[in-house]
Amino acid sequence: MSRHHKTVLNMAKFIQGQSLLLLEKLNELDLDAEADMCERLHEDAERLHAGLLAKLNQE
């Protein structure tokens, strides 16, 4: 796996982690609508990371 591939994976993993932290904070503040949006964002980030990992490991 190239350096660029690792960078892309690290960025996707970072977004996944940050979206989870944001979700926790939004829940603490009882911002339900925003927490719902953030939960979808986190789920998308998980799928993105998993998809990138699978694709880049094939190459």
Language-model features and meaning:
Residues 3, 11-59:
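Short, charge-rich amphipathic interface segments used for partner binding and complex assembly
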